[in-house]
Amino acid sequence: MKKIFSIILAASVSFSFIGCENELNLQNPNKVTDGTFWKTVGDFKQAVNAGYVNQKFMLGYSGYTGTLMRISRGDDVDMVAPNDGSIAGFTNTFDNGTAQAYFSMFYKSIARANDVINRIQDKDFSKEDKDIILGEAHFLRGFCYFNLARHFQNVPVRLIASQDPADYPLATSEQSKVYEQAVSDFSAAAGYLPLQNPNKAKPSKGSAVAFLGKVYVYMENWKLAKETLEPLTKSPYTYKLVDFSWNTTAEHEYNEESIYEVPFSMAGGSDIWTWGEDPNASQSTAMACQFAHPAAGGWRQARVSRTMMATFLAEKDKDGKDDIRARESVAWDYPGCMYYKQSFQEFFDKNDPALKSEYWIIKYQNSKTQESEGDAKSAINERIMRYANVLLLLAECELNLQNQDGAIGYLNQIRDRANLNKYEVSYAKTQEAIMQDIINQRAIEFFRDGERFDDLRRWGLIKKALEAGKDNEYHTQQYINYTDKYQYFPIPAKEIQTNSLCEQNAPWK
């Protein structure tokens, strides 16, 4: 306050000397403008930080509505009380508000990344500072374009930061070109970022390489995907599989399996339900309360489907127990199961006997450490890229390159961690059988992570999966309503209305 008063006083004195002879051009010292910003390394780091908004924001990738949108279309969950029933039931249209917000959040981050990339080129900063700023900006832009391509298909590719309305009209690029832009950005990020980012919440070289390999998988460029991902299994990288439970709670975040996480904490303001960029926003996530039983402070928006449980329980481990990944992801009525610090049986006998036979999501929940999700705040990071994903993507690459032994080798690393028998002990050495185990292992490993529907689409299995679950009350309408146009979301109406060169993608015209 004292400093502000001094500035105002100095301005007043200056004005008294100048009088009316000259116009006085005063800038508000408390307002950030292009003229006062973009000066220091700190300014650029703040600008990059603003680009992460789409990943944490309520409407963004790992936010409340973004996560529910990504998981609601697969066969692995039953959307009991969906946040957006039209998306879950395949009746959404181009004016759907949830998809519009999700789409816009990516372009908001892209605009911020573009600003950083465009403006830093002529700055006289150290190479170290420039590299990490450019690396993060390219990573963020690549992340956005990868997800826009896999969720909306053909979209505009914007690479220039501009406030000029004349620059806004832009035609869509084909999905392959959008993926190519993601490849370009992740490749650039891998060249700029350090092997280990000093800030664990930020991407590293390995993060960029892992996503680059994943884009190649989506492009079905198996050779390049293998060549990209394989180095992550060797020195100088030190990734490895850890106890699966370490990937589901707050206690072991940033462990050796983690390649990229979206961070949450109890820091920040008090506003949990932040629909805009609010200085009072909490840095926590509201996801944990979405799936818990109401008696544990939850909303019971979704539960584990019986189709998914059949996959979880298809194999016993070497000790005759259910798969540890099932037990760490789901609570159900089995001996020793705990649910919000009570035995599962005790909790439901006391609170809701009728729902005792259901399967309850506990992955990324506070069930082990809290009695309730009542305040709706959680600090559990979302694990966006794990080493397990790299191994299973490599298994898929090897299989598509006709190297069955290589695929089985990667599968066995996943199976060993789960204490399952080696693949060859239980299954046939055929392309079909190996692929089926890849499908099953991905469903189990990445349950609740929002991978399932995209996996089913790229394998051409959406209709088959929906047909298998059509007798489930929560999936009957999905089966009835689904047509191929629902493989991707339509370009939102607002983009079509405001971008004169943007045309709706063919299935939605």
PLM feature spans:
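Acidic, glycine-rich segments characteristic of secretory precursors and extracytoplasmic regions
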Residues: 4, 8, 20-69, 115, ...
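Conserved, well-structured interaction surfaces
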Residues: 40-49, 53-59, 81-152, 173-176, ...
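Elongated scaffold/linker segments in the mid-to-C-terminal portions of large proteins
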Residues: 42, 48, 57-59, 81-104, ...
